[in-house]
Amino acid sequence: MFQGASALTLDAKGRMSIPTRHREALQLQAEGRVTVTKHPDGCLMLFPRPEWERFRERIAALPMEAHWWKRIFLGSAADVELDTAGRVLITPELRLAATLERDVMLLGMGSHFEIWDAATYTAKEQAAMAQGMPDALKNFSF
C-alpha cells in the first residue's frame, strides 16, 4: 500500500525519480514494471503492473456509454519500467495532458499513485480545504 506525498522534479527528458521508500515495493510487487495513464481530475495515475491489470479489466467491462472513458484510460496508458536509477519516463503526451513541466507531486493513494503538477495540486488542495468537509465526512471521527 502506497501513501504519503513527495515533491519531485522531472528531468529534461521527462523522467521522475521514484522515492526510495516506494522503489522496493514496486520491485517486489511488479518487478519495476508500472503503467501510467490519465486521471479525470487532470493528473496522472501510476499503477504497479499487477494493479493496472485489475484496473484495466474493470475499465474494459464498462458499458458502451462509457466508451470515451475507456479510450481515455486505456488509450492513454503507457507501460514503463523503472530504470537502474529508480526513475520512470513520463511520455510527452501524458506530460502535456497533466501539464507537467518540472515540479511535480507524487501521492500514494493505496494501490497506486497520482502524479500532479505541483502548483495545480497546491491550488486544488487549498480550494478543497476552503470548501470544508464534504457530507460524506461529516460524521467521520478524527
From Swiss-Prot:
It is found in: Cytoplasm, Nucleoid. Keywords: Cytoplasm, DNA-binding, Repeat, Transcription, Transcription regulation. GO terms for cellular component: cytoplasm; nucleoid. It comes from the Bacteria. The keyword Secreted does not apply. One of its GO terms (molecular function) is transcription cis-regulatory region binding. Residues 5-51, 77-120 form the SpoVT-AbrB domain. Gene3D superfamilies: Transcriptional regulator MraZ domain. Pfam families: MraZ (PF02381). One of its GO terms (biological process) is negative regulation of DNA-templated transcription initiation. Belongs to the MraZ family. Forms oligomers. This is Transcriptional regulator MraZ. It comes from Ralstonia nicotianae (strain ATCC BAA-1114 / GMI1000) (Ralstonia solanacearum).
